[in-house]
Swiss-Prot record:
GO terms for cellular component: endoplasmic reticulum membrane; nuclear envelope. Induction: Up-regulated during myoblast differentiation. Its main location: nucleus. It comes from Mus musculus. This is Inactive phospholipid phosphatase 7. Keywords: Endoplasmic reticulum, Membrane, Nucleus, Phosphoprotein, Transmembrane, Transmembrane helix. Plays a role as negative regulator of myoblast differentiation, in part through effects on MTOR signaling. Has no detectable enzymatic activity. Knockdown in myoblasts strongly promotes differentiation, whereas overexpression represses myogenesis. The modification Phosphoserine is found at S43, S62. Residues 70-91 are annotated as: Interaction with MTOR. Coiled coil: none annotated.
């Protein structure tokens, strides 16, 4: 045993790896696994920085864009119906504008059609009402004429306000006349001549005793005034229909605020 131990010591002494400068090679590498694992652990949570609020907002907007595009490509039923009715209105109004220009099919009748439209203008009606009011000598006549004057002024202000708000152009590029500028009847919606004709005809039918033929002629006159505005290209069909409706409601409003004979006499005396 002592001989074998001395032999082993001599073998270890003669081994090159037992020298001091080579001792590190005999030991297993320490910390080699830890840096790798620590590197993995460190690289795990720091793969990507947390998204900022701006990036999240942009991502959210990019997700919403296809939905908005789908909404535009697939409009609602109301939008389709409205656009269809608008297209029909424009098409039919252009077809009925047979006196819209010098090259139109009924260009020779343009002067006569414009004359029919002038009968529904506000300036002649206001001037005629004031003239009749000055010449009237009865209290009943003055009461009717004062309320008619109130209705005409209400019509001009209502139509001018709605036209200024909507600013719809006519089917043809026709410039308004001097009388149109005086009554602020510049745009197409609603048709001021149509609203005035409807209001005046309803006013006369309610407060004047007229024979049946005159009543029929009064209604036909209001219809022809509205049609003439479409024929010369100043209004669409829906503009005229809206004018008729507004004229009727104006008449109902005047009936609600009807001025009595005493009030009319006070206004006349003050004037």
């Amino acid at each position: 045993m002592p001989a074998s131990q001395s032999r082993a010591r001599a073998r270890d002494r003669n081994n090159v790896l037992n020298r001091a400068e080579f001792l590190s090679l005999n030991q297993p590498p320490k910390g080699t696994q830890e840096p790798r694992s620590s590197g993995r652990k460190a690289s795990g949570p720091s793969t990507q920085p947390p998204p900022s609020s701006d990036g999240a907002r942009e991502r959210r907007q990019s997700q919403q864009l296809p939905e908005e595009d789908c909404m535009q490509l697939n409009p609602s039923f109301k939008g389709i119906a409205f656009n269809s009715l608008l297209a029909i209105d424009i098409c039919m109004s252009k077809r009925l504008g047979v006196c819209a220009g010098r090259a139109a099919s009924w260009a020779s009748a343009r002067s006569m059609v414009k004359l029919i439209g002038i009968t529904g203008h506000g300036i002649p009606w206001i001037g005629g009402t004031i003239l009749c009011l000055v010449r009237s000598s009865t209290l009943a006549g003055q009461e009717v004429l004062m309320n008619l004057l109130l209705a005409l002024l209400l019509d001009i202000m209502t139509v001018a306000g709605v036209q200024k708000l909507i600013k719809r152009r006519g089917p043809y590029e026709t410039s308004p006349g001097l009388l149109d500028y005086l009554t602020m009847d510049i745009y197409a919606f609603p048709a001021g001549h149509a609203s005035r004709a409807a209001m005046v005809s309803k006013f006369f039918l309610s407060h004047l005793v007229l024979a049946v033929p005159l009543r029929v002629l009064l209604v036909l006159w209001a219809f022809c005034v509205g049609l003439s505005r479409v024929m010369i290209g100043r209004h669409h069909i829906t503009d005229v229909i809206s004018g008729f409706i507004i004229g009727y409601f104006q008449f109902r409003l005047v009936e609600l605020v009807w001025m009595s004979s005493n009030t009319c006499q006070m206004l006349i005396s003050a004037w």
